[in-house]
Every structure is written in C-alpha cells, then in structure tokens.
C-alpha cells in the first residue's frame, strides 16, 4: 500500500459520526460530510483531472477512457474499494444516477483503489462487479496513480467534472445524496442539456447496502492485524506474526475484542491455523460485518455466529442463516448480524469450524 495513503481515513470519519450520534446531534450526510461545489466562474480545478485516468492499471466494463473520450461530458468519478461498507451504502445511488442521467450526458466512472492486498486481484474485482450489479466503467487503480492525480484521501469519494474538464464538486464519504444529485443536474444544464430530468432519485436499499442506523451506532471500524488493531484484549497482547494459542477473557469491555484458539496475528490480518478458533467482539450497533476470506483461493471455511451466547435467529445477517451458520467462499465483506431495536451492548462470537480463514476488519452499521 502506498505510504501516501492515510489508512485510518475511514475509521476517523466513522469515529466522528459515532460521537455525533451519541450526542444526539444531527448532521447532513453520513460518514465524513465533507463536500464543496465551485460555480462556473470560480477558480475551479483546471483540466488535467481526466488525464489522471492514464495512470489506471486496467479497465473493466469499458475500453480505457480519458480526456478525448470524455470531452463534452459531465463525469462523476467515485473512488471505491469493494470491501468498503461505506462505499456499498452509496451504491444504490450510483446505479440510480447512472440510469437516470446516462442519456443526458453523464458518465459515471468508478476508480477501484484497493485497501487490502487481495483487492488488487482482478478476478476478485470482477466477481464484486457482477455480484453488486455494477455496469458503469471502472478504472483499476492498484498503483494509486489516479488516486494521487486527484489528491484523493478517502473511500468513498465523489468528484464531478464539468463538460470543460474542470473538477467542480467534491464529496468525501457517504451521504449528501441530494446535494450531489443537484450538482449533477446543474452541470448537465450548464453543458447545454435543456431536458435534464428534475427531482431526486428514490432508492430502496437492502442488505449491506442499507444506510447505517446512526442513532444506535457506538462501534467503529477496527482492523484485526497487529499493525492497526485497537482494543485487543486476549491475554498476552498482540502476536506480531507469531503463532499462538489465544483465549478470550471472562469479560470484554465495549469495542474490545479477543481471539480463542490457534491463530497467527500478522500485520494486516489474523489467520486461523486449527479448526474451532473463535473471534469475540463486544459491540453496540445494528449491523456487524467482517471482511474475511479463505487463505487458499477456492477453499470453503464453515462458521457459526452467536450473539450473547445464543443463535442469532431473526438478527442474522444476509450471509448467515437463523441458526448462525455460514460459509466463507471468497475474499469480501460478510454481513453477519442485522438486529432490530432495541440496540444495546452485546457480545458477538464467530467460530470457524475449519482452519484456513483470514480475517481483516470489522465494520458496523
């Protein structure tokens, strides 16, 4: 991963959001309500942004696009990475805008800049595009060249480029969908599209794409590898690449986590060496998600989840049944818990019935 990247960017945004939710303060948008719009006569970032696409490693869903191919178009550029839950929750809007404005001069371009090493695998990205019904052009930015050309520093991030090639709008994080769509309409109108459809799209987001329950959110993203993890509570502390037998303490404080069984805690993930290893996490949120995958491509790892020592029942996520059973088949984000009100502090446990799983990060919603 490039040293220019702030690996904590999403986590800082989520932490700010949790603080606002806990204080009962409302704020437009979700994660990281950072946005700006430049009028046509302002000192908007001059041309060059579209030339940044020349740094892409590959293109999916489209031949390579650049300034020549996009001349005269309004371009929505979104930086994303396929395991990012914050990006997943923006996806219904990206699909809707693509469909609504495709005949009015809008071109949506996704820039896939990976956070985890396995996200550089093109087969993984192709599978994600198919599973998530992403049909618009995607630039593969594994070398971070496009990211740096835009001076970007967050997932997800939206940039709107006008028909003259100038960056006129930027929004970092989730939310602000009304403002973003209004900016799209304005730039399309400026470009001479007199019949731009008015109003705002209405989306019905389901599963992992549903908006976070901000009022109940008290848990933020946490990585599991020794380099970036927080609140690791197993006796003996972090493993730093060593194979160890871990145990879960009798009690976990909120947002603390622990391992049980034979694990190796590498810098960026934890890897299970023997069957029946567990991860326990004390959380306060509607949703529990875990980025994980088999250590060997093509293998399947069975797991079972419990909440407060009980089967999840109706609180199961989309990747788990009511008895808590699921299977890790690919390297992606798995939604394990989606519970209803009331939301309280609860203890989550996932037991892997087979060895050979790698777990990277928890996210909540």
Predicted regions and their residues:
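N-terminal secretory signal peptides and thylakoid transit peptides that target proteins
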Residues: 2-20
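Non-globular targeting/processing and membrane-anchoring segments
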Residues: 13-15, 48-54, 181-365
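N-terminal "domain-start" segment that seeds a small globular fold
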Residues: 34-68
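Short active-site neighborhood of thiol/selenol oxidoreductases, capturing the structured segment around
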Residues: 66-85, 108
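Loop/turn elements at helix/coil->beta-strand transitions in domains of secreted/extracellular proteins
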Residues: 72-75, 104-107, 134-136, 163
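Structural microenvironment flanking redox-active thiols in thiol-disulfide oxidoreductases
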Residues: 88-132, 142-146, 301-303
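Short, internal strand/loop/helix patches
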Residues: 123-161, 290
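Non-catalytic, surface beta->alpha helical segment in thiol-disulfide oxidoreductase systems
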Residues: 167-188
């Amino acid at each position: 991963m490039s040293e220019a990247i702030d690996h904590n960017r999403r986590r800082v945004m989520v932490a700010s959001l949790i603080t606002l939710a806990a204080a009962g303060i409302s704020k437009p948008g979700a994660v990281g309500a950072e946005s700006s719009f430049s009028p046509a006569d302002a000192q908007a970032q001059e041309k060059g942004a579209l030339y940044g696409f020349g740094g892409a490693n590959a293109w999916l869903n489209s031949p390579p696009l650049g300034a020549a191919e996009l001349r005269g178009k309004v371009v929505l550029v979104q930086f994303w990475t396929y395991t990012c839950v914050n990006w997943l929750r923006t996806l219904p809007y990206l699909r809707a805008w693509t469909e609504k404005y495709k005949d009015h001069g809008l071109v949506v371009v996704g820039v896939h800049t990976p956070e985890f090493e396995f996200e550089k695998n093109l087969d993984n990205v192709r599978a994600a595009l198919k599973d998530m019904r992403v049909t618009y052009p995607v630039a593969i930015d594994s070398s971070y060249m496009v990211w740096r050309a835009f001076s970007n520093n967050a997932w997800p991030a939206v940039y709107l480029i006008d028909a003259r090639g100038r960056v006129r709008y930027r929004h970092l994080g989730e939310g602000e969908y009304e403002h973003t769509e209004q900016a799209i309409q304005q730039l399309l109108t400026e470009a001479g599209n007199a019949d731009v459809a008015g109003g705002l799209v209405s989306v019905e987001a389901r599963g992992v794409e549903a908006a976070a329950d901000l009022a109940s959110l008290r848990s933020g993203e946490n990585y599991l590898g020794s380099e970036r993890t927080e609140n690791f509570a197993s006796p003996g502390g972090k493993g730093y690449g060593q194979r160890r037998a871990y145990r879960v303490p009798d009690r976990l404080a909120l947002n603390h986590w622990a391992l049980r069984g034979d694990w190796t805690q590498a810098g960026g993930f934890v890897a299970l060496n023997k069957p029946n290893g567990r991860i326990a996490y004390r959380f306060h949120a509607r949703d529990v998600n875990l980025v994980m995958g088999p250590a060997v491509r093509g293998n399947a790892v069975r797991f079972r989840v419990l909440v407060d020592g009980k089967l999840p029942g109706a609180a199961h996520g989309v990747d788990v049944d009511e008895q808590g059973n699921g299977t890790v088949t690919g390297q992606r984000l798995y939604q394990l818990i989606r519970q209803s009100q009331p939301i309280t502090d609860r203890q989550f446990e996932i037991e892997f019935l087979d060895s050979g799983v790698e777990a990277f990060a928890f996210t909540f919603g």
